[in-house]
Amino acid sequence: AVSAAAAHADELSDMKAQIEALNARVASMETAPSVPAGYQLLAVSKGEALQVPGMMGSDRDRVTNERATIISVMLTADAPAGTTISWSGYVNAAVVYAGNDDQWKIKGKDADGVQLFTTITISTNSNDDWDVKARGQLRVVATTDTAVGEVGVELKMRGDFAGNGVADVYMKTAWGYWAMTPELTFGGGYAGSLGNIGYGYDGACSCYYTDNADVGFNPGDTSQMRLSYASGPFSMAVAIEDAGIYGGFVGDGSSSNGNQLGVAGEIKYWGDMFSGEISGVYRMVDGNDYTAGTVDLASALTASFDSDVDGLWQVGAGLGFNLGDIASLSLAAAIGSGPFTEVNNYTGEITTSLPVKNDWWGISGLASANLSDAVHAEVGLGYKQRQTDGQSFNVDPDLDGDELKSSGIDYTTWAVLGGIYYTPVDQLTIGLEAEWFTTNYSTSTKATADIEGTDVVAGDKLSLDYEQDNWSVDLVSVWRF
């Protein structure tokens, strides 16, 4: 009996020890962190901004989007960071002085070559335009690691100001993507076209309030779906684009090509000392938008037009050379044909659309040098020529045929810009910028019939030569986070 009691006591002691060990283990589990040592559920840091796969931005975009606040979220204790948010933005303001002077020369001759009137020369000058302009931008990139690969979005929101009044915030970029493999990415949304040449005067300059000349090679931002491939320094992409243009001809509020699509592609190489790209774009047009319509030529004069526009296409290339941290050179060239359009270099919006076909080519370059760790300077030069097809206008609906025939417009632009920028820290830049460009065009129009209600008779010919010089100087400051 004594030995049995001793055995039971030993069993109770062992059981008690096991219960105490279990209690200690449970207590340690309750006090243990939910993630391994050295990790946090939410980490906030400063670093390089996330670059979206397949978004082949310009040199200017790479500089603008260089730094950001990085937010990393860990979903579980045994998994790497599942969601990363890159949050960056800036505000800039500038005192801008701008002006221009232009000269019109108008000549008229009748069918026999006799001068109808003394050559008319009209000169105007506007050199006292002072403004304080400002802009705010917020860029957010969010990525999540999923079972099928990385999925993410990019949102870039802007607001522009020039005096009193609130800004209409607009989306410069709204993009989503799926990295199906480390090399292959499928994306879509609203962004710049792959057909844009992201080098040269327009693609590589800092240009906070310069780059106003028509020497860029941007077909205009648009909604699209894109498939891209990247491996090491080599990348390529192809996209299906919407070819619609909204805003109409001469701002009449109509739209064109609303039921048409386009395609764009790009091949790019990016190395430490050398980079380059070859890009192309083709956008279909709706012939009905260019062969049956009217355009307001003056307050009391409306003409119908009939243009032979088959589609928009452009092929171009860009080259970049880097001399370490000392200097860089960026070159761009392109050739194309299609409807006459002009694009806002800041927003990517097509601001001018005319019902006439034009062919164009151009070349530009930008050189940049680091004068010190905090100071860099740049200078750019650009040239672009446009040649429009001849145009016919039916001014009098009671007469068959076209009473006015235009020879087309020979349109050239020369531009030069420069800037010097002081950046003592990543969050601050102060710069002095300047730009000058000259635009020249010449055209002639001949009457093929007498036009009722005017002094114009068949055979009369009117020629126009126009030259405009434009300049701007600004002191700009940029604050970033």
Where are these regions (language model features)?
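N-terminal periplasmic/intermembrane-space "pro-region" immediately following the signal or transit peptide
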Residues: 2-92, 97-99, 104
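Outer membrane beta-barrel
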Residues: 68-247, 257-275, 320-324
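Transmembrane beta-barrel strands of outer-membrane/channel proteins
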Residues: 89-97, 153-159, 188-192, 238-242, ...
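Gram-negative outer-membrane beta-barrel proteins
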Residues: 95-103, 146, 161-163, 194-198, ...
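Short sequence motifs at beta-strands and strand-loop junctions characteristic
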Residues: 129-133, 166-168, 216-219, 257-259, ...
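Membrane-embedded beta-strands of outer-membrane beta-barrel proteins
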Residues: 138-140, 174-176, 225-227, 265, ...
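Detector for outer-membrane/organellar transmembrane beta-barrel domains
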Residues: 260, 265-417
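Outer-membrane beta-barrel "beta-signal"
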Residues: 422, 465-481
